[in-house]
């Protein structure tokens, strides 16, 4: 490669790296550090109250059971979106659900730095029949995953409305994660 071409390539790479926010670079490199930067402290999750396990590892994938929004006091948010919760409150519930999933994932792996990427998410929203902004609700979760894992937090996703969810929680999300080799 000619010297001029190498210089052009290096300049372009520098521009690309400078255009990526520092927080996204940190997130991709070290999600554990990124959680600290965000002020998020993961707790040890309570054991399931039904006959299932929170996570199953198969090869380099981890399948996480559905989780709901747990408030700071340890209680679930309860109610229907469009009745007890506004869109913004429901997005916050989805974010809290993301924290619950990260707690379950860390309990399974011991270290979130083992995560290569978030692969697939199913977001379920307990909403009144006329509510149709399910995808916007689940953005509360998806935004958190990108904040924590950078571009590796972007994922395939379905967001659906439900007539009810266990314990009358407003949001339940399940997730599939790929691990580093």
Where are these regions (language model features)?
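Bacterial N-terminal signal peptides that target proteins for export
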Residues: 1-11
């Amino acid at each position: 490669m000619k010297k001029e071409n190498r210089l052009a390539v290096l300049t372009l790479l520098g521009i690309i790296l400078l255009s990526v926010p520092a927080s996204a670079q940190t997130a991709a490199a070290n999600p554990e550090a990124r959680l600290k930067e965000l002020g998020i402290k993961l707790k040890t999750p309570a054991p399931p109250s039904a006959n299932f396990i929170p996570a199953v590892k198969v090869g380099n994938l981890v399948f996480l059971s559905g989780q709901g929004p747990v408030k700071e006091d340890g209680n679930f948010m309860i109610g229907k979106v469009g009745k007890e919760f506004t869109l913004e409150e429901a997005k916050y519930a989805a974010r809290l659900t993301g924290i619950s999933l990260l707690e379950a994932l860390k309990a399974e792996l011991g270290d979130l730095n083992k995560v290569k990427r978030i692969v697939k998410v199913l977001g379920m929203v307990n909403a009144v029949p006329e509510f149709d902004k399910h995808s916007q609700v689940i953005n509360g979760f998806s935004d958190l995953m990108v904040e924590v894992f950078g571009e590796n937090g972007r994922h395939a996703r379905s967001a659906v409305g439900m007539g009810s969810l266990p314990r009358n929680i407003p949001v339940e999300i399940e997730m599939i994660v790929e691990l580093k080799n």
